């Protein structure tokens, strides 16, 4: 249980301040356009669109900006064709890194990712080289809430696990197949999560020292900052004492 909490804190600790707000919004717009093109503009029938819109709103993106992005996707006003491409590699101390991207130019994207890995002591590898070190699963986070009610609704809906943390937050863990059903069931029961996503959780972690952490953070920040990057996952274990120095 503690491991999952640590993983989530590491992945989201720096949050929005890692990247300029304009770049974050540009990425949301791209994801909204693609989700709309793929599943339609009716949010009730398109869980992927609902997810990205929720994330955009949580980042304080304006509703009219979101609506314009949906319009661009539904009316084919954006003529670019995007591919979902995953890149895998290694950071310092053998840490495993996954970079999920949305790109309209694979050559540009791989060149930028390779440059980031090389600049900060990493190595871009081949497909499948590190993904086996992670488990794909659904993650639903409640910063506060009625633990008993959340547990009852989530488990009845098919959740794999419920994790309660010392700070009062509650994590609901699901399979990828059941994620949207369980999330919608919780929302219908008026249990609104503060954050939810389908993510990649490391099976094991690699502990980093202060020296390695500095270059590792520069690497992951550089990867996150790329225009084509959607998500960056890793299995680094960075202590609270070290992370507070950055």
Swiss-Prot record:
Pfam family, one: TACO1_YebC_N
SUPFAM superfamilies: YebC-like
Major location (coarse): cytoplasm
GO cellular component: cytosol
Domain of life from the UniProt record: Bacteria
InterPro entries: Integrase-like_N (IPR017856), TACO1_YebC-like_2nd/3rd_dom (IPR048300), TACO1_YebC_N (IPR049083), Transcrip_reg_TACO1-like (IPR002876), Transcrip_reg_TACO1-like_dom3 (IPR026564), YebC-like (IPR029072)
Subcellular location(s) per record: Cytoplasm
Listed Gene3D superfamilies: 1.10.10.200, 3.30.70.980
Disulfide bonds: none
MF (Gene Ontology): DNA binding
Iron listed as a keyword: no
Keywords assigned by UniProt, alphabetized: Cytoplasm, DNA-binding, Transcription, Transcription regulation
PANTHER family in the cross-refs: TRANSCRIPTIONAL REGULATORY PROTEIN YEBC-RELATED, TRANSLATIONAL ACTIVATOR OF CYTOCHROME C OXIDASE 1
HAMAP family, per database record: Transcrip_reg_TACO1
The family this protein is said to belong to: Belongs to the TACO1 family.
Protein name: Probable transcriptional regulatory protein COSY_0365
Organism: Vesicomyosocius okutanii subsp. Calyptogena okutanii (strain HA)
């Amino acid at each position: 249980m503690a491991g999952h909490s640590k993983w989530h804190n590491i992945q989201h600790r720096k949050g929005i301040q890692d990247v300029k707000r304009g770049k974050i919004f540009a990425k949301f717009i791209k994801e909204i356009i693609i989700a709309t093109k793929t599943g339609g503009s009716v949010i009730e029938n398109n869980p992927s669109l609902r997810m990205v819109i929720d994330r955009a709103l949580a980042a304080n993106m304006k509703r009219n900006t979101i609506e314009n992005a949906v319009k661009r996707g539904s009316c084919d006003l954006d003529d670019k064709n995007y591919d979902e491409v995953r890149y895998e590699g290694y950071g310092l101390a053998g840490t495993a890194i996954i970079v999920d991207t949305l790109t309209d130019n694979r050559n540009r994207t791989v060149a930028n990712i390779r440059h980031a890995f090389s600049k900060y002591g990493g190595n871009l590898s081949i497909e499948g080289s590190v993904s086996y070190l992670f488990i794909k699963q659904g993650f639903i986070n409640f910063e506060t809430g009625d633990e008993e009610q959340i547990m009852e609704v989530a488990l009845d809906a098919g959740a794999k696990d419920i994790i309660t943390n010392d700070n009062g937050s509650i994590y609901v863990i699901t399979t990828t197949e059941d994620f949207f059903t369980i999330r919608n069931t919780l929302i219908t029961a008026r249990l609104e999560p503060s954050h939810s996503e389908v993510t990649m959780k490391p099976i094991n972690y690699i502990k980093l020292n202060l020296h390695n952490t500095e270059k590792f953070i520069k690497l992951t920040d550089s990867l996150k900052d790329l225009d084509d990057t959607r998500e960056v996952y890793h299995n680094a274990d960075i202590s609270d004492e070290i992370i507070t120095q950055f």
